[in-house]
């Protein structure tokens, strides 16, 4: 049974991010610079939602001179990191929140036909009756809000530790964001 009480929302986004040194500003422009991108868009798992949207974008925007390359998130990030170090042009699939937006300055390419759906949300949901059964928990969840940058900061710390110490990194986040955390408490 899916809980039916939405109690908070966080901003999220998916699309095609790029480094600011890449002078392309919109997805349709990619076809004009396909050679600079080695005729590739680097993606993740072929069945991921963002990959389906990227295949749609290739069709809708006529990006037939670009090939969507699937792989793991790790392989996509490795290729992206290597290209950034070499100051090469690269285009990848991306989403917020993700630690790469904290690690590197990135911009989403404009999506004039809204293939990726524009701004999205991450929702916190609770089971029916939680407000009556556990009012403090409900109140905490109701006011719990953090920015994509705050989420990404925690994610980059966890990633830097190769996911070995998420609890310690959560404590680090709490220590460095005391006023934010206190604003969530009943």
Task: Locate predicted features.
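Extracellular/periplasmic catalytic domains that process cell-envelope and extracellular macromolecules
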Residues: 4-7, 34-36, 85-86, 117, ...
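Domain-level detector of nuclease and nuclease-like folds
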Residues: 76-77, 125-127, 135, 140
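Ligand-binding pocket segment of bilobal, Venus flytrap-like solute-binding proteins
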Residues: 44-112
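Solvent-exposed, polar/charged alpha-helical surfaces in well-ordered, non-transmembrane soluble domains
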Residues: 28, 32, 52-56, 78, ...
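C-terminal functional modules
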Residues: 144-186
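A conserved helix-loop-strand patch within extracytoplasmic ligand-binding domains
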Residues: 1-43
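Short amphipathic alpha-helical coupling segments at ligand-binding clamshell hinges
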Residues: 26, 132-144
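A bilobed periplasmic-binding-protein/Venus flytrap-type ligand-binding module shared by bacterial periplasmic
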Residues: 9-20, 120-133
